[in-house]
Amino acid sequence: MSILIENISKRFGSFQALDRVNLEIKNGSLVGLLGPSGSGKSTLLRVLAGLEKPDSGRIWLEGQDATQMKLQDREIGFVFQNYALFPHLTVSENVAFGLEIQKIDSLLKKKRVNELLKLMQLEKFGDSYPNQLSGGQRQRVALARALAMEPKVLLLDEPFAALDAKIRKQLRSWLRELHHKISVTTVFVTHDYSEAMELAQEIVLLENGKIIQIGSAQELSDHPTNTFVTNFLGLK
């Protein structure tokens, strides 16, 4: 699904979180929203998801105005930073949660859950509970649950922030391979420039609610637009 963000602004009290943001995201791309704390990256992701309403501007999904559309109508999967798994449900039950709500046929539901557990390399953990899993495994369960409803867009809010450096690096490689397999338009938030540069096909760098530069890791490294980009990416 293609995404067009058109002149989006969002204020929280006196704080300008987003200031006339314009961005086009191509169908099937893997995009990283990068920036320091308070830059607006997570707010932009939440506006995309329908979890926050913009003060002005429009969100277009595949050419359709989705600005006022509810999250459940946007065909979007959202993965929260803290995973938001249900501790009293098994891995399989967590993955199947959205399918249960939609009253999907039990055989189709089981088939879909098994496919996702295999895709996430979690086949052996279907009957386990979240507290029996590592952080990396819990993150993969959260991704499987987000993908269960076959969304056209996958949004991830700092998906690896709570993990140690070794696991983060492993999951970055795994997520890149997963995106190559499923080709779902994917947007993730990070404050870690090395993570964005390793994972994203296109990086959107924000500061103070504005987009400062858009480009590949190579383009940002070779042609930084100003001293903020140079300093933030450690190019000095």
Swiss-Prot record:
Q: Give one Pfam family, short name only.
A: ABC_tran
Primary enzyme class? translocase
Write down the chemical reaction(s) this protein catalyses: sulfate(out) + ATP + H2O = sulfate(in) + ADP + phosphate + H(+); thiosulfate(out) + ATP + H2O = thiosulfate(in) + ADP + phosphate + H(+)
Please list the residue ranges annotated as the ABC transporter domain: 3-233
Q: Which InterPro entries match?
A: AAA+_ATPase, ABC_SmlMolc_Importer, ABC_transporter-like_ATP-bd, ABC_transporter-like_CS, P-loop_NTPase, Sulph_transpt1
* Highest taxon of the lineage: Eukaryota
Q: What GO molecular function terms would the record report?
A: ABC-type sulfate transporter activity; ABC-type thiosulfate transporter activity; ATP binding; ATP hydrolysis activity
Name the residues that bind ATP.
Answer: 35-42
State whether keyword Transmembrane helix applies: no
The primary location reported for this protein is plastid
Cellular component GO terms, alphabetically? ATP-binding cassette (ABC) transporter complex; chloroplast
Q: Which UniProt keywords apply?
A: ATP-binding, Chloroplast, Nucleotide-binding, Plastid, Sulfate transport, Translocase, Transport
Record's subcellular location: Plastid, Chloroplast
PROSITE patterns, per the entry: ABC_TRANSPORTER_1 (PS00211), ABC_TRANSPORTER_2 (PS50893)
Q: E.C. number, please?
A: 7.3.2.3
> What function does the entry list?
Part of the ABC transporter complex involved in sulfate/thiosulfate import. Responsible for energy coupling to the transport system.
The family annotation for this protein states: Belongs to the ABC transporter superfamily. Sulfate/tungstate importer (TC 3.A.1.6) family.
What is the name of this protein? Probable sulfate/thiosulfate import ATP-binding protein CysA
This chain's source organism reads: Chlorella vulgaris
The uppermost taxa in this organism's lineage are: Eukaryota, Viridiplantae, Chlorophyta, core chlorophytes, Trebouxiophyceae
Gene name of the encoded protein = cysA
